[in-house]
Amino acid sequence: MRTGPGAQRPVGGVRSGPDVKQQLTADEATFVEKHVRETHLRAPSADLDRYAEKDRWIIKPSGGYNAVGVLAGLDCSLSAWEKRLRLGAQNHDVIQAYAPQYATPTLRGGTAAHEDPTASVLANNREGLYLFDGKVGGVFTRCGQAHTIGEFTGRLNMGCFVVHE
């Protein structure tokens, strides 16, 4: 078992199932619990009450590309969250435990002529590792002004560096 570059949604959605648990050793199961966020695939018959505490969750489409339709509970009202949960259950969407981000002042770049290019905005950050052949090959950072950092939510992609041995 090792952490890899794959998205957590497909892995996380099946990690708690009985078929997976039967295949893992105790050490492997502990590793998965530690490194993969709690994730559930929803069905129309799903009990949605466990997700009522909206600030603990994020909901995403179940397909491979999930920039459209992602909603963090922190970014919406309770009624909007409940509506999105019902829609997500109909569409078999994925619900994950929300991984809190930290915010830092960020230089935006690409400012308009009348804007101060040195002015910073507060942005939430999400880091990740590029893994190649089982080794760390670099670091990436994405940041945004909402709790969902996606292509259509004002995401800023930050530079990355590559580690050479």
In which residue ranges do the predicted regions lie?
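Active-site nucleotide/adenylate-binding loops and adjacent lid/helix of ATP-dependent enzymes
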Residues: 1-104, 108
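ATP-dependent carboxylate/phosphate-activation module, predominantly the ATP-grasp catalytic core
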Residues: 68-165
